[in-house]
Design a protein with these regions (language model features):
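Catalytic cores of glycan-processing enzymes that make or break glycosidic bonds
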Residues: 1-185
Length: 185
């Protein structure tokens, strides 16, 4: 049993209110769920988790179920890239994703998945550079509980082009994600 909200109140007294997000992935006890609710901190939603057959693909991970007060990802540094996920995940999970997203193959799956979270009500979305670039498993950042090749991926000079920046800006305009000062995270 930790200090609960007393810890966050003490931190706020010392350094003021901060934008904090809670990593609420994995097993959550009722007391942790209550602490998250009491704190008002946004939790995390991972689109890849929506298709995970090992846990029934909880509906809370489908973008239409995201509350505004959350941070949405396709996957985090601990997951495979969107493109890599299509070959590393269970085939039935990939099929579920294709069916849900309305696609028949992995062509542009990174953009399709990013658009799904951008179209959600999540106040904040974060995408991996590797997903913006359409990279596969070879660029995965971290594989939890392993040693050796984690945290080695580096962007190469010139990979972030003006064309990519224009495409991202167009997507942000399309989904109303530019200059949203009214949105608190």
């Amino acid at each position: 049993q930790g200090p609960g909200m007393d810890l966050f109140h003490a931190v706020e007294q010392q350094i003021g209110a901060q934008n904090i997000m809670a990593e609420d992935l994995g097993y959550m006890t009722e007391s942790v769920k209550k602490l998250l609710a009491d704190s008002g901190f946004p939790g995390i939603k991972l689109l890849q988790f929506a298709f995970d057959s090992r846990d029934g693909g909880g509906t809370s991970y489908f973008p239409e179920d995201y509350p505004p007060n959350c941070v949405a990802y396709v996957g985090t540094h601990d997951n495979d890239t969107a493109v890599g996920w299509t070959t590393s995940a269970e085939p039935e999970d990939v099929k579920r994703a294709y069916d849900y997203l309305g696609v028949t193959d992995a062509a542009d799956i990174n953009w399709v998945m990013m658009r799904a979270i951008w179209n959600s009500r999540a106040n904040l979305t974060i995408v991996l550079a590797q997903d913006l670039l359409g990279l596969g498993s070879e660029s995965r950042m971290n594989k939890p509980s392993t040693v050796g090749s984690n945290w080695c991926w580096r962007a190469v000079e010139g990979c972030f082009t003006d064309a990519l920046a224009a495409k991202v800006r167009g997507e942000m305009e399309r989904f109303g994600r530019l200059d949203r000062p009214d949105k608190k995270v």
